[in-house]
Amino acid sequence: MRNKLFGHVLFFISVLFWGTHCFASDMKIDIRDVKTSAGIGYWYKQKEGLPLVSMTMAFKNAGFIYDPVDKKGLALLATSLISRGTTKDGESIAKLFQEKGIIFHVSVDSDNAYVTLKTLSENLDFALGLIGEVLVDSPIDEEVFVIEKERQKSDIRRDSSDPGQLAHNMLNKVVFGDQPHAYDASGTLDALEGVTIEDVENYRRENFDLDKLVIGVVGNASEEDVSRMLDKALARLGRGQNSKVIGDAVLNIGLRGYVAYDSPQSVIVFAAKSIPRKDPKYHVAEVLSSALGGMGLSSVLMQELREKLGITYNVRSGLYNVEGASLFQGILFTDKTTARKGVEAFLRTVQSVKEKGLDKRALEIARAKLVSSTLFSLSRTSSMSQVLVYLQLHGFSADIHNYSARYESVTLEEVNEFAKNFLGDFTIVEVGAENNIDATITS
């Protein structure tokens, strides 16, 4: 797993790119906000038909930006290890899941740790029982620990020669400096070397906190059965032990960075200040961002830089939000001979939208994409459980039927007025054979 510009090993990357936080107004989806007898809350959607259940759990404030400064990479290593543990009888948990055809995964992003599960309804109790062991005390073999640590080190070494990852890391370094928001999921070789099995166990004890747990359940199982199984499986998890917080980041915007890399291509990344998800205008920012660089060939940036100027095969942009930091980011791939021209065209296009606004066609395509793309996600049991967790994490209510109206109601006047204040200065980083952007910060 590697910490990519728009991914950050994001568990929800497909959800976010599909626009699954908006909902078609003609879909009738009954979401129940349930509390078990033990006080475990979850959102539940019963889906009859196939005997399948999908469940997603998120443990807040367990992501890699919360890694101790001298243990960077711990969260990623810990979440990759705990699913490879054994039962108290010494049986491989991964093998037990596999034998029953259960899909199970533990992952981490910048903010949170996640557990995903997809199983036949008849195996749900069994699967949750094993998850309860995984989250509390399933033994981790020393040999497996060494193998996983070496694998993560290998990823770090590989990333050191990947131009996209180099660009991302340098952008984080310039924008965030030494703040936790600059951490990479894999950590550093030096920090990872000092991580022990005891650190992994401490991570498990501290971060799998019932008070930080968010759950989404979709499938063919009764609410009563799901509640009973959750109470039994998670009975040994603690409450209140995770007290970690991350403050607001100080953003360094308007700077230029450069990483020398011998290649005929340049990778150029951009970052500007954005707004947090809780901002009442966030949905307007989503529409604007989608129109600018989130619609593939239909986006404003692709039309200008690829179709008209022919200086890139791919340019895109999007909103990036983590705890304490909100950015509008972009990435441009171009030949080293057109890198300067590409940056100038990118900034000129953004400035044009800032001053003149979007046209009606761009707005309509962006709104339609945000509204209609959710249909695909909501038609799938597994992705829908992720959507339910995403909504809870970001403060939405269980009544999802009015969400698409937020996007449909955005007018051309509103988005263009918003663009005047939203689009500002950029920090820019280039990775390539030549410093085409007059960068003063180099690596």
Enumerate the language-model features and the residues they cover.
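Bacterial N-terminal signal peptides
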Residues: 8-19
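N- or domain-start disorder-to-order transition segments that initiate the globular core
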Residues: 24-53
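Charge-rich, well-structured scaffold segments of protease-associated domains
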Residues: 92-241, 258, 308-443
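Positively charged n-region of N-terminal signal peptides that target proteins for export
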Residues: 1-7
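His/Glu-based metal-binding/catalytic segments typifying zinc-dependent metallopeptidases
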Residues: 47-49, 56-59, 242-298
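M16/MPP (pitrilysin/insulinase) zinc-metallopeptidase core fold and M16-derived inactive scaffolds
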Residues: 56-118, 184, 295-311
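Short, solvent-exposed loop/turn elements at domain surfaces
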Residues: 43-44, 51-53, 64-67, 278, ...
